[in-house]
Amino acid sequence: SVMITGASSGIGAALARAFAAEGANVALVARRPDRLDQVRRDIEAAGGRALVCACDVSDAEGLRAAADQTAEAFGGLDVVVANAGFGVSGCLEALEMEDYRRQFEVNFFGVIATVQAVLPHLIRSKGRLGVVGSLAGCFGSPTTSAYNASKAAVMSLTESIYHELDEHGVSVTCINPGFVASEIRSVNNQGKYTGNPDPVPRWLVLPAERAAADMVRALHRRKPVVFIT
């Protein structure tokens, strides 16, 4: 069984469909139950099985409940992908400290909360953990200091826990995508969906389904790191 955070759209939804197509039972975790229900219906229409767990990754108790519910429903938990995140943008002088805190609360501390929630189940199954970083964590660029810093922190965290969890038989894969088709660039600094068009040229953007296929392959192979471009 597989649990994916940020599963209501973009990479998360594509991952859910990809795992379900392989026959995995999938738990869908995100804030928007209506969008999760749509992904669930898509999976079930294709003959798969999915469970909806409406939860924000800033809610540690909710994440633990989602992990326990998934393990109970599917008889264990084998793969978890910590994918939930959003992007704060703006020049340093224009952003408030609260903007940086909000960015790290979801992108960094949300990953920690997710890992802590699922870890007992993954240790039991000697499973696989995927953490979605970003190519943006490898460099700096104007107006994205909050997002880039949060993803750099995620990449460093993932490298550290890779070594910690290896002794438990749990593999950790740091997944670093470039531009992938998703709603992340249509979300404002408060994490709210705006519906604005993606400003990145379409020829630079990888289809979510293709990115998800590469990510699933890396998780099956228990690769420590993968770059998706």
Give the location of each predicted region.
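Conserved glycine-rich Rossmann-like NAD(P)H-binding loop of the short-chain dehydrogenase/reductase
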Residues: E22-Q38
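Residue(s) in the substrate-gating loop at a strand-loop-helix junction
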Residues: S134
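Substrate-binding pocket helix/loop in short-chain dehydrogenase/reductase
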Residues: C91-L92, E96-R101, K126
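The beta1-alpha1 cofactor-binding region of Rossmann-like NAD(H)/NADP(H)-dependent oxidoreductases
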Residues: D34, A54-A65, M97
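SDR active-site lid
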Residues: E167-T229
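Conserved glycine-rich cofactor-binding loop
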Residues: S8-S9
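Active-site helix of classical SDR
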Residues: V115, S150
